[in-house]
């Protein structure tokens, strides 16, 4: 789903695609949590309940869905593509529509199992909860999202007359179906703004006035909870003439954690990369990748340039790691611990251009890290800038077997060569 958003706004982003997403840590919550939150803001959502055990599943079926003939059982992981995913146990699909008396059985096949989707990577994610929902009778499926758009310097509503799993393809084949409505961040959403969205979607059955109110409520949720992205796919029309958020994905700005206590209490660290969780605890910007060369760099731009040059020389970066401009020795030590905890890392490249960040602090951190962590892989170090001579002296006097480099190109080349030794 997120692919469409990236494609539609790529012109307004200085960095598009995957790397853009890596510059901000964003809270991602489960579908059932998003539905609960939307319900509090008056957004129409399907009746549903989350369960983490077969006992809870059985109770929910009896208490919440006593008269339903069919239910939707949805695995809850923080990744897209669940419907087309495969469990390592062999079960196909992380979303199933089943008869009421089959719901407990299918939930049992999901709970505690690892689901692999196009977004999880081959390792997959463990399903700790399932979401039981009423099966809606849908007459139309559409797409709706709100994002933060740099070009318009504010929220942007993106909608499409057609929804579902093929939204990216539809955006390419039928660009005239895409509706984009920028919202004035100071004035907020107006009736006219909401009407543009609804008239563009042209609902077949849902009441126009009610639909306008639903769009306004979705925007209020986006604004009041510090969302960075709200995506509903599908935004569905039911046989009862209602507009319903049938499936939603919400991300929130981590910088708002101090004032969004209720929202951030929903965080599920068990679904996050443990390395990213550890990095966040010490204020490091870290994103795990699948390569072999661990990177520690100061500055997001330099970090991305470092990864690009590693690729240019035939290597693959194992991570994005920006220690920032004011890192302490402790943070450098913790950064090394995170890098060395990745079994795929066969070499480490430290690339520091000291401005506010001092090279001697980095050097001391490297030496202290070596005392706490058994460095079993070659380490390539390129230092330049503030206190560079002090930094080089600290490294030399440490007696560590380091590979030094004169510039970034040299450092990347040496890191790639070090993989062969």
UniProtKB/Swiss-Prot annotation:
Pathway: Carbohydrate metabolism; tricarboxylic acid cycle; succinate from succinyl-CoA (ligase route): step 1/1. Binds 1 Mg(2+) ion per subunit. ATP binds at residues 74, 81-83, 141. Keywords: ATP-binding, Ligase, Magnesium, Metal-binding, Mitochondrion, Nucleotide-binding, Transit peptide, Tricarboxylic acid cycle. One of its GO terms (biological process) is tricarboxylic acid cycle. Residues 1-26 form a transit peptide. Substrate binds at residues 298, 355-357. The keyword Transmembrane does not apply. Its cofactor is Mg(2+). Residues 35-278 form the ATP-grasp domain. Its EC number is 6.2.1.5. Mg(2+) binds at residues 233, 247. One of its GO terms (cellular component) is mitochondrion. It catalyses: succinate + ATP + CoA = succinyl-CoA + ADP + phosphate. It is found in: Mitochondrion. InterPro entries: ATP-grasp, ATP-grasp_succ-CoA_synth-type, ATP_grasp_subdomain_1, Succ-CoA_synthase_bsu_CS, SUCC_ACL_C, Succ_CoA_ligase-like_bsu, Succinyl-CoA_synth-like. It is an enzyme of class 6 (ligase). HAMAP family: Succ_CoA_beta. Belongs to the succinate/malate CoA ligase beta subunit family. Succinyl-CoA synthetase functions in the citric acid cycle (TCA), coupling the hydrolysis of succinyl-CoA to the synthesis of ATP and thus represents the only step of substrate-level phosphorylation in the TCA. The beta subunit provides nucleotide specificity of the enzyme and binds the substrate succinate, while the binding sites for coenzyme A and phosphate are found in the alpha subunit. Heterodimer of an alpha and a beta subunit. NCBIfam families: PRK00696.1, sucCoAbeta. This is Succinate--CoA ligase [ADP-forming] subunit beta, mitochondrial.
